Amino acid sequence: TRYRAITWGGPPCYWLQFPNWLYNCWGILMIAGMDLFSGNVIIDTTDEETILDGIARNYETGVMRRHLTGGWRHPVEFWDEAEKFHCDMVILHDDITCKGALGLTGVILDQAKERTTKLMVVSNDMFDHRTISRADIRQQVNDYMYSVMQAEPLDASLLQYDDYEGW
């Protein structure tokens, strides 16, 4: 393992092997993804009122809800998580179809300038591989790793390959 990273934002649903590729090609160990930071939610089931209150609070503080419309604290939350896990970088999945996340990208880029943890922004279309393909995503990562991290791949044969028709 060369690098430790967490991901934030909606990853492409059409490339579940992204963490495997990161590790095998570049030595980036994906410690955790955004959805793992929800914690264990315990809802009081004493009566209907407490159940509804618990469900409402869970929705109010759920990761995707905070990610899209959360308060001022949310945009810095992943920096705290990256620090807890001793990460070298945060990989921000910049889903081009998510207006909430697009609005935060500028704020997050400004925050990254003040941090030692690197920020890799990877654009994707969560549900449509024709818009931004797996090859496009690989190229974004490759460009970042070469230019920002000044790194060489562990396995150059994995930099690009034809998987356009792959599921």
Role assignments for model-derived ranges:
Residues 1-3, 21:
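Hard-cation-handling environments
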Residues 11-79:
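Redox- and metal-dependent alpha/beta enzyme cores, enriched for Fe-S-associated oxidoreductases
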Residues 13, 67-72, 98-102, 128-131:
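Acidic-and-aromatic substrate-binding clefts and catalytic sites of carbohydrate-active enzymes
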Residues 58-79, 83-86, 148-167:
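Extended, charge-rich low-complexity interaction segments
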Residues 106-167:
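Peripheral docking tails and interdomain loops at the edges
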